[in-house]
Amino acid sequence: MSDPEMAWVPEPPAMTLGASRVELRVSCHGLLDRDTLTKPHPCVLLKLHSDEQWVEVERTEVLRSCSSPVFSRVLALEYFFEEKQPLQFHVFDAEDGSTSPRNDTFLGSTECTLGQIVSQTKVTKPLLLKNGKNAGKSTITIVAEEVSGTNDYVQLTFRAHKLDNKDLFSKSDPFMEIYKTNGDQSDQLVWRTEVVKNNLNPSWEPFRLSLHSLCSCDVHRPLKFLVYDYDSSGKHDFIGEFTSTFQEMQEGTANPGQEMQWDCINPKYRDKKKHYKSSGTVVLAQCTVEKVHTFLDYIMGGCQISFTVAIDFTASNGDPRSSQSLHCLSPRQPNHYLQALRAVGGICQDYDSDKRFPAFGFGARIPPNFEVSHDFAINFDPENPECEEISGVIASYRRCLPQIQLYGPTNVAPIINRVAGPAQREQSTGQATKYSVLLVLTDGVVSDMAETRTAIVRASRLPMSIIIVGVGNADFSDMRLLDGDDGTLRCPRGVPAARDIVQFVPFRDFKDASPSALAKCVLAEVPRQVVEYYASQGISPGAPRPCTPAMTPSPSP
């Protein structure tokens, strides 16, 4: 029997699936010599573009007399899928002991995004001089690795035997507390079991907590276990204690059926009683680690983000020849459709290896017969609707506008179903190789709401997410309904969505903000949706691709 007042569960860690700690390992090959007699003493400086400026965040150690260094010091960064995170790697010669690069010590640099590195696991790029030319045949290789274990969970089961009796007319009511030792040597409570009434041989309920909560992901961190006899007054009687580490707990229960036990010691009794042995024993009956896969696990395991664009060409956007039109192609300012395309697509393209994106339009009359279509290729090639990079999507959009007639209605279901087709074929593989993201840019109320709800409910069971950006000042109430944030979306027949896959954002909320703010908002949910889908299907990430640079080890610094 347990006392509910004593049952305590720590606050679970926030589900920040989009944020991970990434370590970058850097090596260079063929660095330029400063002169014919000496080789450089290279160091790599890492800068991150933040708040409109480049800020140094990390640097490697200096290696002496080495033109092809493999650095041992890792460069650590927080990774966010929904942010672009541009990086610069500057290589300089620290022969004279300088701690910052100067023109005469500069050996080359390169620029890329963190997304490009993690999606490819390993990136090799030429080093460029300040004039933009290659620094000879110099190259830099960056290898990404996620800091593992931060999302793992632990399942533990404890029981005790022959605990000291602290009650006069009945038996003890034992419970146990677990503490981890912090860096400042203070103890932090991480778990308290329930109370087992009137029992000197209690079996506590199994419990589950994150490895971070238990030991801050440090398997060698000291853990302290304290056993008490519960008292309703709050003055619980101390029975005994013992210490361990998670490493020891894992090793002691490594084999099937293997258990680990500790003597429960009361220091006061041990010091005063000559023949004192213990105040009972505590047994660890189960210690298992549950691997919780992250978004980066799937990306680094080879999962590609397949990005598709759908653009609203209904008449409610206004005549493109008018400066008031949402599709106006002004030479001075890109319209909202273009701004959203660049902001969101610029990030998604880093996660697609071939950088080719299907782009469709809906709600327009299209040549040659000028019949209304709700899923036409904006490059007018139905057999190959893909565009080369986001710049290709933008170019096709610009060429498409003068050739079509904006019409209506605003039917969204056809394009959702079109993208759902390949997603369903991907689902049948049972592997985490391709996840589809559909970006819908629209200016108004959905005309086929019932069909759209049905299409979304169907897509919620597939490896697919939908991002809707509302352009203009229309009433977007229906879009918020599709988002599902206020409750589970259902199709007209009452079938619920398997998961929330729609993210809606009105562009007007970001028209005065930076493009990165819009991208951050609309893409923030994608990592969670990716992990949710594959976890629901029991699909693990693929094995990380080999990424060790094949280079000769550097001489010792």
Swiss-Prot record:
The residues that the entry says bind Ca(2+) 2 are 167, 229, 231, 237
GO molecular-function terms, A-Z: calcium-dependent phospholipid binding; metal ion binding; phosphatidylserine binding
Q: Which residues form the VWFA domain?
A: 306-526
* UniProt keywords, alphabetically: Calcium, Cell membrane, Cell projection, Cytoplasm, Cytoplasmic vesicle, Differentiation, Endosome, Membrane, Metal-binding, Repeat
Domain comment from the record reads as follows: The C2 domain 1 binds phospholipids in a calcium-independent manner and is not necessary for calcium-mediated translocation and association to the plasma membrane. The C2 domain 2 binds phospholipids in a calcium-dependent manner and is necessary for calcium-mediated translocation and association to the plasma membrane. The linker region contributes to the calcium-dependent translocation and association to the plasma membrane. The VWFA domain is necessary for association with intracellular clathrin-coated vesicles in a calcium-dependent manner.
Q: Where is this region: Linker region?
A: 244-303
Q: Which InterPro entries match?
A: C2_dom, C2_domain_sf, C2B_Copine, Copine, Copine_C, VWF_A, vWFA_dom_sf
Its annotated function is as follows: Calcium-dependent phospholipid-binding protein that plays a role in calcium-mediated intracellular processes. Binds phospholipid membranes in a calcium-dependent manner. Plays a role in dendrite formation by melanocytes.
Its GO biological process annotations read: cell differentiation; cellular response to calcium ion
Broad class of where this protein is predominantly found:
cytoplasm
Q: What is a single cellular component term in the Gene Ontology annotation?
A: dendrite
Cofactors named for this entry: Ca(2+)
Q: Which residues form the C2 domain?
A: 1-127, 134-263
Q: Which family does it belong to?
A: Belongs to the copine family.
Assembly, per entry: Interacts (via second C2 domain) with OS9 (via C-terminus); this interaction occurs in a calcium-dependent manner in vitro. May interact with NECAB1.
Pfam entry (one)? C2
In terms of CDD domains, this protein maps to: C2A_Copine, C2B_Copine, vWA_copine_like
Q: Where in the cell is it found?
A: Cytoplasm; Cell membrane; Endosome; Cytoplasmic vesicle, Clathrin-coated vesicle
Protein name in UniProt: Copine-6
SMART domains linked: C2 (SM00239), VWA (SM00327)
Residues bound to Ca(2+) 1 are 167, 173, 229, 231
Superkingdom of source? Eukaryota
